[in-house]
């Protein structure tokens, strides 16, 4: 709760409340954000499917779903879209995988090699 309040105070000080999304894999953190700072956009970082990422994202009012790339299927992406989620995938470092996920229609990629992603995805 203390961390959430610190984030909220900093965001207010710098007039960033409407420009940030706090992401976490912790349901405790997402719960605290929901309770203490509902005006801050939230995102779920999902690494496993044993807790349905779409259900958890909905439960905590998330607007973003950051999926481990291995969890990103066309079906899951379509369901996330219907739920109104921005879908980001991580960590995507191989050009062929970047292209495949972009072709699926993900909203963003998280990579250790941004220049590689730009050159890969700018090619027709």
Locate the predicted segments by residue.
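Short loop-to-alpha-helix "cap/lid" segments that border enzyme active sites
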Residues: 1-124
